[in-house]
Amino acid sequence: MRFWTVTGDPVPKGRPRVSVVGGFARMYTPAKTKKWEDRAEKIFRLNPQGDMECGPLKVIVDVYFKRPARLPKKGAAQYNHITRADLDNCIKAVIDAMQNAELMQDDKQVVRITASKWYTSSDDPARVEVSMQSIGSML
């Protein structure tokens, strides 16, 4: 199993934007999403922990948001994060960054996902913890 930690505030995958230049439509990823994906991709590339995966994959994503002041410092990690970013959009950003880092050939290889959102405990940094495992042939 491979494991990575992307520190910093998690950014969910934003909706693609469209602009018209010279009568032609151009689609692009929002700047905040692009910046986070680029940072995550760099972390994945610097520590690939093996070759590109070709078969079916299991991905585990744990998203940790900074603890709000209203929650107690002790035990904040036991609270699930239920506001702001949708978990599915956080997963999309992570998997896109993994594919861009050439950890997998295509995101369709991901056949099993386990994900959760939490608040960080005490003064821990906001982060995304990602692990990926090849699960062998599905035949």
Language-model segments: residues:
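Acidic, proline/glycine-enriched N-terminal capping motif
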Residues: 1-139
